[in-house]
Amino acid sequence: MKVYYLNRERFSKGDTKIAFEFAKKLILENPNLNILTFLVYQQRQYESFLSEMGFTKQHYKYHGFVAKNGVRIQIHTIKTYNPDYQFVGSPQHEVLIAVGVPPKELEKYEDKSDIYACIVIPWLLDENLSFLNLHEAINIETNELITTNYNIDQRVVNAINWLKATS
């Protein structure tokens, strides 16, 4: 899973639109991607999110809709989201936009083969830095890798490289 992020100290209105535009670009570049999922932490976050993105209560009720280009757009909380669910047809390849989802919740999805990319929009950037550094996240506005501000012990780096080589 590729990890992207929006480099903001705090979540602000309009961040979801920026991530949505980036996700649309990813989907246009890769014809195998057919699902775009917005993942929020709690249900009450839906109301402001839906109005900001122009979605209606019907979209909330059915957890999404199918866009004109055939891409299914889903809206879920961490309790209703199931990346293992398969739609009829081609294999599912998904772009996940995680809005204010804590790193411990994101870790549950990092090994799911159906998720092509995860775009992280943190409530607070500091809270997600360890997850973003670990996954070598790319800033969606500058296309640059996140810069780490700590050193990893060389033994750990060697162990990671060994695991990559033998996997």
Predicted ranges, named:
Residues 1-167:
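Short, flexible loop motifs at catalytic/binding sites
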